[in-house]
Amino acid sequence: MTTDQPVISLRPGGGGGGPRGGRLFAPAFAVAASGSGDFLRPHGGGASGVSRIGDLHSESRERVRYSRDQLLDLRKITDVTEQILRLQQEIEAELNGDDQSWVRNDSNVQLQTQAQPQVQAQNRFTETDNRDWRARTEKPPAPAVQEEKSWDNIREVKEQYNASGRQQEQFNRQDQSSSQKAQVGPPPALIKADVPWSARRGNLSEKDRVLKTVKGILNKLTPEKFDLLKGQLLDSGITTADILKDVISLIFEKAVFEPTFCPMYAQLCSELNDNLPTFPSEEPGGKEITFKRVLLNNCQEAFEGADSLRVEIASLTGPDQEMEKRDKERIFKLRTLGNIRLIGELLKQKMVPEKIVHHIVKELLGSDKKACPDEEHVEAICQFFNTIGKQLDENPKSRRINDTYFVQIRELVANPQLTPRSKFMVRDLIDLRSNNWVPRRAEIKAKTISEIHTEAEKNLGLRPGATANMRNGRNAPGGPLSPGGFSVNRPGTGGMMPGMPGSRKMPGMPGLDNDNWEVQRSRSMPRGDPLRNQGPLINKVPSINKPSPINPRLLPQGTGALIGKSALLGTGGPPSRPSSLTASPTPLPAQTTASPKPSSATPASVPIPDKAASSAKVIPAGLQKKTASLLEEYFGIRILDEAQQCIEELQSPDYHPEIVKEAINLALDKGASFVDPLVKLLEHLYTKKTFKTEDLENGCLLYGSLLEDIGIDLPKAPTQFGEVVARLILSCGLRFEAAEGILKAMEDTFFRKAIFTSVTKTLGADPAGQAILSSHAAVVDACNSLSI
């Protein structure tokens, strides 16, 4: 019989006795046995070792021991598959759960955990197995309580591991922060200010409190609030000489850097000098300290210190000092001119004697008459004489001295060293004195609000007090009535100045005139330039720089003067108060009926006057305001007889076309609901013989000439105006030929088409209107050609 094949015993039940052992290790050991004779010991035949599978466990066999090197040789042919590694990771994940504290941030630990399965797989075969697996007794199964305890043990171990991991992470962070601090170094120390800010406002000294109060008063000082703030300044607590000096320094700095307000500050200095007490001198035997003496000392120091400042500025020659030099030059110039201006204003307040003024002029001109003064000195001289030249010439003695000064000043013009700018300043000064110190342009100075409004009224041609009425008006429209039945209270304007949002009145239309007639805003008076509204009546020019779009030949005689010029482009008289009005009462040939004339092949046209008549008739200046007021009253109460009575009381038949124009304008401005009251008013006045056909036609012509400007703000005005014209034609108040004249009075074909379309639509809806259209086919064709 053959000997058995050698059997390997590494695990319980291992070796060649089992089927698994034979399949796994027999080929490998066969190769190993063929390679080395001493590697495996013969134990039996090879065939019998495989065939006797059932008797392996029962028979005693010799244990085979392997050295470390032999096992390492076996490792070379053993590879751990990826499937086994994946299963290992899944098992570890099930045991560890979702606790993220198991994973550490340290990269070395991560590398170690990644390589752990491979190291464990390697360590299985590096140690020699000396245990007797056959003699090991089988343990009984553990009860369920032990399983729970085992899970508790695993949980405890896991918690301990987590705690140790957190401690390790904290230690790593501390170590990392300490290493960063070691690299960066300690933080820089805070730099404390020499005079740190403190929130303890209640600990201010008496002097600081007074100066703070004075600063606030000076910052709010204006000519309007002068009296109020002057009293507060006197009561601020100027009780010592030190406080007085600091207060004077604050006033001096404000006056120097705000030369426009120098007159106000000079007046303030005069008031303070008269009301503040004097203080004893700090030196024995010295003069007492007064406001005037301290102020003049400041002015003298600023004037005499200009040379040292000029030298200091000239020393700044470095390229990096150019910006600093420019700033100091600007401040130096402001201080010099401001100081000169303040000294001049103090002379007007009689706080500076004239001898100081003459001393300053001599210093600025220089002792050498042939030498050219500095440009700063020349500008200061011109500023000085602009301020006090008139006052010096009022005194005969000072005037003779001024003559000597101006002889030297005239010589400066011919000096080639003087800059052109300085030459022009000197020439302006010479011209100013020759013109008796009346400047060509108004001097810029601080003004009160009332002075600003007075100047605005003068420039805009308003009645004195118009802006004050606009600002202060608070009365409601429903006040007492005048004898004519109209309200004499002016409605509130809603705005402080003319043209401001919310204001009802426009410039040139103040509240009430001397006859207590209320004035209402009119759309024909545009919202742009108020001077365009100041014509003799209520007419306007569509643009100042372009002629009126209306053809004066289409207007009635005498109205060309009303439309052709505004007060701004006229004779140059006061625009808001014309003294006379030139008008020609020559009427158009009357045609009282509008009966159709089928046999007429040539359409009748509005007669064209060749020239205005020379006769003149004076119309009251307040006629325009009364017209606007009575129309407003009518559209409010809509009583036809009362409106007729008011119009007849005007006693101005030549002004009736203007009334028609204003009525149309005001009604269309208010909206479509006022078209019917407008037509009823015009028809009533025509029926009562108050208005004639010529009045209605000329009034429509006037409004048509303004429609191009009005239509911008009122897009529906052309259509509504066409409806008014058509209804007046139906009532025989207008001839149909007047529609052609109205279309010719405007240039925009869009407005022409809108008006004529509305006329034909309104007439076509009435049988009488259809007859008028059919009988005036030639006029219709002419109007259609104008609308294309």
UniProtKB/Swiss-Prot annotation:
Domain MIF4G: 211-436
Gene3D superfamilies per UniProt: 1.25.40.180
One GO BP annotation of this record: regulation of translation
Record InterPro entries: ARM-type_fold (IPR016024), Initiation_fac_eIF4g_MI (IPR003891), MIF4G-like_typ-3 (IPR003890)
Biased composition (Basic and acidic residues): 126-139, 146-159
Polar residues bias spans: 161-182
Domain MI: start-end pairs: 622-744
Biased composition (Low complexity): 113-122, 498-511, 578-605
SMART domains, per database record: MA3, MIF4G
Name of this protein: Eukaryotic translation initiation factor isoform 4G-1
Organism: Triticum aestivum
